């Protein structure tokens, strides 16, 4: 009998062309399905994720599901997958899920984090894991601006022109930031995120911190529903899909 398996995984997005499978490109989904096909003796197994991540974007807590006829315990699945996956993907947790569980459609909220290193000199070892930003920032102004991001808004100004969904209203439950030595970490929890939304919000908030735009410009951007009213898109390497929230 077929079983539905739910996995939580981490990956370093540096050497992937994103999560979603692309012909001739190295992707997270491609690596997962390659290993599962080997385990199923050549039978193709389709993997479904909570959402896609772009090239260079990392995941601390991505969630996937797939269906299988193999009779392995969750612990056996975890060991078998980790033994065959490349070292930039790690399966952290495996559970047998209810057949109705869906990694994407059962998700109630997602948490993204974005890391910015505020220092004059670049760190060669951190260059793929945070955004190097050598400018002084007004932290108080940025916190005020972040509070305006919280709540239910139309995020048309804060998503890529490539966004292919018509309903761009999302609810952000938490938009916060904290300093850890020279590392500034943004945290966003919401019921859904549009294409490049977190990276555009971060780029905009950094412009507030640098004095390039006012705190009020956040409200104006929401009203305008026009990408040109928000700031630059922050680069991919600072972004992490941190956690996916489900009812259970």
UniProtKB/Swiss-Prot annotation:
Residue sites binding substrate per the record: 112
EC id: 5.4.99.12
Molecular function, one GO term: RNA binding
Active site: 54
Keywords: Isomerase, tRNA processing
Gene3D superfamilies documented for this protein: Pseudouridine synthase I, catalytic domain, C-terminal subdomain, Pseudouridine synthase I, catalytic domain, N-terminal subdomain
Pfam families cross-referenced by the UniProt entry: PseudoU_synth_1
Keyword Isomerase recorded: yes
InterPro entries: PsdUridine_synth_cat_dom_sf (IPR020103), PsdUridine_synth_TruA (IPR001406), PsdUridine_synth_TruA_a/b_dom (IPR020097), PsdUridine_synth_TruA_C (IPR020095), TruA/RsuA/RluB/E/F_N (IPR020094)
Catalysed reaction equations from the record: uridine(38/39/40) in tRNA = pseudouridine(38/39/40) in tRNA
Biological process (GO), any one: tRNA pseudouridine synthesis
Complex and partners: Homodimer.
Stated name of the protein: tRNA pseudouridine synthase A
């Amino acid at each position: 009998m077929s079983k539905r398996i739910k996995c939580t995984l981490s990956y370093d997005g540096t050497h992937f062309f994103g999560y979603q499978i692309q012909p001739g490109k190295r992707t997270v989904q491609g690596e997962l399905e390659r290993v599962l096909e080997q385990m199923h003796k050549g039978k193709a197994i389709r993997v479904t994720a909570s959402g896609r991540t772009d090239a260079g974007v990392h995941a601390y807590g991505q969630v996937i599901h797939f269906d299988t006829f193999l009779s392995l315990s969750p612990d056996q699945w975890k060991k078998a997958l980790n033994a065959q996956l490349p070292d930039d993907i790690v399966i952290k947790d495996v559970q047998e899920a209810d057949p109705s569980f869906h990694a994407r459609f059962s998700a109630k909220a997602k948490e993204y984090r974005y890391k910015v290193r505020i220092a004059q000199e670049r760190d060669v070892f951190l260059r793929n894991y945070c955004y190097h930003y050598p400018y002084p920032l007004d932290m108080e102004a940025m916190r005020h601006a972040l509070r305006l991001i919280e709540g239910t808004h139309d995020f048309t100004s804060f998503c890529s022109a490539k966004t292919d969904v018509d309903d761009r209203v999302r609810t952000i439950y938490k938009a916060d930031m904290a300093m850890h030595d020279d590392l500034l970490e943004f945290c966003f929890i919401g019921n859904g995120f549009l294409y490049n939304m977190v990276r555009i919000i971060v780029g905009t908030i950094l412009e507030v911190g640098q004095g390039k735009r006012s705190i009020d410009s956040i409200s104006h951007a929401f009203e305008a529903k026009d990408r040109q009213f928000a700031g630059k898109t922050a680069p991919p390497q600072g972004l992490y899909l941190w956690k996916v929230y489900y009812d259970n």
